[in-house]
């Protein structure tokens, strides 16, 4: 009975801690909902409203014809910043909630894509066309691939592979695309889809459909022209087999049968060969019957979540996961003072090199694959600690109903295992004057995107000293192609007949600073050597570094190019606000990146990613410049709907203005044998820090009660001074691991 009473006491104590709420701020709760993703109810209301409009002639997105008008995407349309700030800062009425809707008009003489803004939610009654800079229209060929188009692609591949069934069977060691059981072939399609504006033709490569099929190319690639909306008119333009090009399937098959080409025959498939799987193998010196360390919250979480609003250790912000791109935060404040209006992911690209046509064509622009919707379930204890708060997400993309993604975002507090601050002050006599330290606990907001082969882990990390870190970690499978004699110029052999292709990852972020208000300025700070006579030894001289500040008054001067010397500090500040010591209140951006440009300026495809020219560019805020890219740039990079270069071309003044920093981070990845079965996160994480630079009068983490100070009394005994309970609670979860992994229509 004593044990039962003890368990009940522990459960009650832990439960009470979990429901403990931090103090609420009316302004924050008033405004957070403006940035919340659309609810299932709102998504369905927008869909139903548009489907009832006879002039649009909408049909189901999943109906098989390509000649149809259908909804591709529904997501939140953000309010104008000025209107949002009136609600946040003045307590005025919130602007109406609106939806951004992408409609594909395939059932008309001149097919196109049109975007609408639908208002007001949850009871929509009006809509307007959403326009882009230069009134740029959206070509139909630039639309993303859909479930239906992939079904048609599979059908033409069935015809193609039936023609070459013997070739493929003999080449792959007993695999086929049709009439197969456990030895089937699958395919990967490549983008951009063509070489010029208006094209829609894709290189497709075949792989063995086994676990980790990305690592199993068979040496067959085909160029399919699928521009026509009648899939019966799709056709093969080119075929590549074992480093040889052919103009048609008929030519390939004839030359194969006549022995007029160089054949390749992969070894018989070994079911026991686990190289592309996660199944453990090899020798481990770690005990397999003992679990590793686990996280615990002795008195429950110390952060507060209310819908899409989060508070933690002085921080407060709202968040959303944009279906078209991914994680964003809004109204970022510390102790109630705004630092940024928006910090959000814009784009992720991976540009490859290779010797096969698919490899040399691969320039993935991930918003074109609806990167934000690839938010699948997170595994407790692996993707996030078991103690995390898990949040479900809902997306409406290439569907006829909202799709529910269970546990797709997580929030947790983490001890980093390294002090935030510490000092041991020795007395040089075998003792000490004092020891002081503060544990480094942070809040992590995390989501992932699995864009086909790659998995991106997106983190926003909030420190107690007013620092925010934005980090992306890359994992998942490498994009592999068939190894050719010339292939090692473009990567590394990672298995028999398999080349891991070199590629560059670049990630783009938007940081809309509002440092103590909207009127901000930007300067860079570097060092210059100075040489002067030593004032206390006139026959000698002093050489040392001196601060050198450069005020960037225009957008062009604040656009820093890759390949140029970079200043050490990027400082954003409010010239009208000072801290206690007379310094302008500011924050700086510190890059953690190994990025470089992916293509020379002037290359056709580079036009679609002009933001990739700059590790940092600063512009004036405009509501018309909400994002640096678009989901259409993937399939039409040659004349993109959104070109970031347009944002800085007008070269506007930046002094005492509402400033937006556009940050590019990334790294080169030359695959290596340790990328098998897939890429690990260590060394593959990049990002940036937002660090206070005279924003506070002192380190704000001094407010933390987790500080520990130890001094010696006169007898030499340690005297511990702390402001938290000396004993930690016992709320340790004993729940077994569970994982569902499914997502479903709702």
Could you describe each region identified by the protein language model?
Residues 2-17:
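Cleavable N-terminal signal peptides of Sec/SRP-targeted secreted and luminal proteins
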Residues 17-196, 201-467, 473, 477-486, ...:
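Extended effector regions of multi-domain proteins
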């Amino acid at each position: 009975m004593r044990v039962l009473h003890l368990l009940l006491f522990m459960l009650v104590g832990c439960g009470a801690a979990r429901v403990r709420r931090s103090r609420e701020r009316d302004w924050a709760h008033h405004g957070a909902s403006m940035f919340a993703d659309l609810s299932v109810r709102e998504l369905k209301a927008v869909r139903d409203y548009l489907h009832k409009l006879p002039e649009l002639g909408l049909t189901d997105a999943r109906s098989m014809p390509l000649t149809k008008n259908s909804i591709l995407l529904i997501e939140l349309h953000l309010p104008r910043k000025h209107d949002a700030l009136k609600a946040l800062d003045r307590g005025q009425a919130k602007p109406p909630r609106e939806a951004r809707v992408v409609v594909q008009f395939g059932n008309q003489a001149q097919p196109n894509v049109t975007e609408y803004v639908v208002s007001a939610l949850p009871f929509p009654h009006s809509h307007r066309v959403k326009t882009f800079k230069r009134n740029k229209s959206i070509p139909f060929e630039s639309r993303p691939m859909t479930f239906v188009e992939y079904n048609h692609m599979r059908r033409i591949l069935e015809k193609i592979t039936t023609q070459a069934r013997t070739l493929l069977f003999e080449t792959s060691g007993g695999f086929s695309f049709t009439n197969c059981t456990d030895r089937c072939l699958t395919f990967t399609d490549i983008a951009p889809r063509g070489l010029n504006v208006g094209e829609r033709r894709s290189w497709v490569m075949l792989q063995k459909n086994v676990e980790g099929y990305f690592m199993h190319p068979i040496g067959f690639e085909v160029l399919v022209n699928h521009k026509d909306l009648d899939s019966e008119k799709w056709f093969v333009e080119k075929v590549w087999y074992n480093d040889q090009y052919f103009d048609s399937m008929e030519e390939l098959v004839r030359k194969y049968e006549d022995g007029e080409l160089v054949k390749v025959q992969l070894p018989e498939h070994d079911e026991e060969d686990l190289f592309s799987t996660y199944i453990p193998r090899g020798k481990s010196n770690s005990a397999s019957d003992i679990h590793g360390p686990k996280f615990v919250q002795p008195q429950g979480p110390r952060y507060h979540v209310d819908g899409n609003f989060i508070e933690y250790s002085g921080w407060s912000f709202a968040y959303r996961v944009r279906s078209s791109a991914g994680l964003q935060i809004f109204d970022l404040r510390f102790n109630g003072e705004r630092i940024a209006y928006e910090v959000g992911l814009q784009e992720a690209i991976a540009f490859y090199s290779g010797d096969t046509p698919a490899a040399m064509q691969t320039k993935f622009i991930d918003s074109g694959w609806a990167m934000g919707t690839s938010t699948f379930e997170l595994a407790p204890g692996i993707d996030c600690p078991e103690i995390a708060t898990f949040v479900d997400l809902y997306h409406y993309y290439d569907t006829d109903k909202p799709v529910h993604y269970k546990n797709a975002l997580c929030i947790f507090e983490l001890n980093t295992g390294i002090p935030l601050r510490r000092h041991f002050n020795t007395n040089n006599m075998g003792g000490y004057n004092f020891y002081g330290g503060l544990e480094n606990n942070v809040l992590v907001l995390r989501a992932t995107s699995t864009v086909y082969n790659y998995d991106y882990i997106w983190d926003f990390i909030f420190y107690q000293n007013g620092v925010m870190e934005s980090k992306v970690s890359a994992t998942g499978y490498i994009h592999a192609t068939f190894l050719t004699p010339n292939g090692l110029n473009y990567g590394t052999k990672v298995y028999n007949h398999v080349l891991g292709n070199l590629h560059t990852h670049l990630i783009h972020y938007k940081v809309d600073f509002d440092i103590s208000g909207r009127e901000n300025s930007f300067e860079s700070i570097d060092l210059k050597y100075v040489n002067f006579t030593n004032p206390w030894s006139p026959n000698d001289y002093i050489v040392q570094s001196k601060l050198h500040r450069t005020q960037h008054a225009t957008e062009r001067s604040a656009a820093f190019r890759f390949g140029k010397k970079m200043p050490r500090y990027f400082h954003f500040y409010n010239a009208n606000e000072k801290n206690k010591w007379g310094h302008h209140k500011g924050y700086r951006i510190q890059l953690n990146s190994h990025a470089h440009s992916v293509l020379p300026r002037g290359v056709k495809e580079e036009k679609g990613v002009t933001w990739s020219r700059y590790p940092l560019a600063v512009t004036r805020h405009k509501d018309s410049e909400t994002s640096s890219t678009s989901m259409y740039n993937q399939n039409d990079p040659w004349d993109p709907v959104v070109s970031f270069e347009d944002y800085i071309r007008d070269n506007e003044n930046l002094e005492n203005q509402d400033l937006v920093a556009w940050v590019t981070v990334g790294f080169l990845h030359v695959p290596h044998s340790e990328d098998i079965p897939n890429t690990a996160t260590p060394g593959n994480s990049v990002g940036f820090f937002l660090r206070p630079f005279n924003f506070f009068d002192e380190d704000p983490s001094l407010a933390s009660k987790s500080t520990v100070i130890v001094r010696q009394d006169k007898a030499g005994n340690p005297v511990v001074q702390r402001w938290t309970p000396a004993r930690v609670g016992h709320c340790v979860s004993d729940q077994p691991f569970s994982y569902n992994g499914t997502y479903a229509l709702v």
